[in-house]
Curated annotation (Swiss-Prot):
Name this protein carries in UniProt: Malate dehydrogenase 1, peroxisomal
Reaction(s) this enzyme catalyzes, per UniProt: (S)-malate + NAD(+) = oxaloacetate + NADH + H(+)
Enzyme superclass (EC): oxidoreductase
Classification via InterPro entries: L-lactate/malate_DH, Lactate/malate_DH_C, Lactate/malate_DH_N, Lactate_DH/Glyco_Ohase_4_C, Malate_DH_AS, Malate_DH_type1, NAD(P)-bd_dom_sf
EC numbers: 1.1.1.37
CDD domains assigned to the protein according to its UniProt record, in alphabetical order: MDH_glyoxysomal_mitochondrial
Keywords for the protein's UniProt record, in alphabetical order: Glyoxylate bypass, NAD, Oxidoreductase, Peroxisome, Tricarboxylic acid cycle
GO molecular function, one term: L-malate dehydrogenase (NAD+) activity
Residues that, per the record, bind substrate: R122, R128, N160, R194
NCBIfam families noted in UniProt: MDH_euk_gproteo
Role summary: Catalyzes a reversible NAD-dependent dehydrogenase reaction involved in central metabolism and redox homeostasis between organelle compartments. Peroxisomal NAD-dependent malate dehydrogenase involved in fatty acid beta-oxidation. Reoxidizes NADH from the beta-oxidation and provides NAD for the conversion of fatty acyl-CoA to acetyl-CoA. Does not participate directly in the glyoxylate cycle. Required for maintenance of photosynthetic rates under photorespiratory conditions, and carbon flow during photorespiration.
Phylogenetic classification of the source organism: Eukaryota, Viridiplantae, Streptophyta, Embryophyta, Tracheophyta
Catalytic residues as annotated in Swiss-Prot or TrEMBL: H218
Single biological process term from Gene Ontology: tricarboxylic acid cycle
Amino acid sequence: MDPNQRIARISAHLNPPNLHNQIADGSGLNRVACRAKGGSPGFKVAILGAAGGIGQPLAMLMKMNPLVSVLHLYDVANAPGVTADISHMDTSAVVRGFLGQPQLEEALTGMDLVIIPAGVPRKPGMTRDDLFNINAGIVRTLSEAIAKCCPKAIVNIISNPVNSTVPIAAEVFKKAGTFDPKKLMGVTMLDVVRANTFVAEVMSLDPREVEVPVVGGHAGVTILPLLSQVKPPCSFTQKEIEYLTDRIQNGGTEVVEAKAGAGSATLSMAYAAVEFADACLRGLRGDANIVECAYVASHVTELPFFASKVRLGRCGIDEVYGLGPLNEYERMGLEKAKKELSVSIHKGVTFAKK
């Protein structure tokens, strides 16, 4: 490689060349195959909304993941700065930035996993559904580009309200003829992370050793922790069950209020999103028994979408697990969750079909 090519390679994150021109004139790297020199083969990951409150820590943590060989960072503003900053980290993933709608398709071409934290954050007094009118349109636009440029990629949706944005993405993919229920997942991992943490606090355990299934959806009463199925098995009083359920359901509000208008749960959300993305990549690699909770197309209930345990594999979701035995408190919670979820799903589908 001559010096000009080396310089072009190093500075590509600041002003990514057009993919079609690159192929036509044979200069620079083939973006689809680019990888750090000496880096081990891995997966190509795009983050849409990479310059936001969730996107920045998410991008940093994904740059640290050894399973990532190429990391594309897209946003409508500030993407070059975030990309330049993260690209200085001495890990093997090649980082490239993409700015604005004209570069969206190039950002998505050839990706194995697309993570979407794009959208506006919650502020005090706002519910996740208050975000709907802004974030629904963003998710629809991004999903249309995914359907065109990387229809076989696994898609992780973080943008709230997840209960509605996942159905929106599904409808866009159906319209494009690319919908694969195994590859579309709403990220509810933060509910699981919170549940593990709060249960560990109550029971004086190491949170890394606690597993709490959280099913339903990703907002308020649709978040249903199955405390009867905690591992290791724990015995809770009714007061503890009610306290834990309420705190898990309102963990996001707790952070929004604590930040007093300065943001929402960005850092813990980025951590949870990376945990889930890593599980998806390990599944793609062929690792066995990768089981996490996610909001997916489902037959577990009568609703078309529902969060439950899923087993991840080379094609995305290999299996969607049922709920298992529920106690009376959980059965009552399930009925409340389904009622609200049904409205949110319908809202998303209706928006996408307009």
